[in-house]
Amino acid sequence: MFSATRHCVAALALGVCFILPAQAKNQPYGEIATQQARHIATVFPGRMTGSPAEMLSADYIRQQFADMGYQSDIRSFHSRYIYTSRNKTQNWHNVTGSTVIAAHEGRAAEQIIIMAHLDTYAPLSDADTDNNLGGLTLQGIDDNAAGLGVMLELAERMKNIPTQYGIRFVATSGEEEGKLGAENLLKRMSAEEKKNTLLVINLDNLIVGDKLYFNSGQSTPGSVRKLTRDRALAIARSHGVYAASNPGGNPNYPRGTGCCNDGEVFDKAGIPVLYVEATNWALGKKDGYQQRGKSKAFPDGTSWHNVML
């Protein structure tokens, strides 16, 4: 977990620095995040959307926020996804997911959303099951217990600090089936709430990748990119953490931008996004999918949803 802790340091420093004044440093950065990530991964494996483990983990996260003094609740949402059988028959699977929201009120009406998905991969086909992808035993430490751990540590560090803007800590579900929880969250937001959302910070896959990346949404204005992505890179360097942004080797993903997780829902809605992830945008198709160089431990250079890795 050493790399995860290092990544946590950068993510926490990012949130603290561009939102808040100087903070107390009673504990080493990443210590709380590491403990929480390990607990969530080992106690709640198989956090598939709508499963008992997902509901229990959502309640655990809600209780953690409540213990910190936050107003916190769980919002259920109904959705569905397609499952493909071995004979190529496709059927809809209905699910009820759980989204956890905790509120830190600010002096102004504007808000920043800090988000990490709590669900693990559910097999979308018989082929997925045959290949040990997802299911009841997948702990999901990289995807995405570590992201939850970072979010919980940031919430702990910020709980007694007045802020200019409100902060919403959100643990979504249904990300693995197509960003279902994020879509529901956006759908429930009023036009005024969307207007007042200055930034969405999405934490996902913080361990396995070769490098820590800070990337902006494609619709995020240049001025906001400088205040968020570029400042995050500078903060990471100041903490001795090497961080990068997408070099733009794939024309579908321009330099300095990210994609392909819950943050994308808000990016497409025109809300500024900062993606925080660990991967390697210089490998494979240069789309961020290949997380690291291929090796005996990671034959494909990825750990995506594989119970065996």
Describe each region flagged by the PLM.
Residues 1-9:
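Bacterial N-terminal signal peptides that target proteins for export
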Residues 9-19:
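Bacterial N-terminal signal peptides
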Residues 25-28, 41-55, 86-91, 133-144, ...:
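Second-shell loop/turn segments in exported
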Residues 32-35, 39, 52-72, 146-153, ...:
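Extracytoplasmic/secreted proteins, especially bacterial periplasmic and envelope-associated proteins
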Residues 39-42, 46-105:
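A non-catalytic alpha/beta surface segment that caps or lines the substrate-entry region
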Residues 46-47, 71, 78-82, 107-108, ...:
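Solvent-exposed loop/turn segments at secondary-structure junctions
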Residues 76, 209-309:
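Active-site-adjacent substrate-binding region
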Residues 96, 135-224:
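Acidic/histidine-rich catalytic neighborhood of metal-dependent amide-processing enzymes
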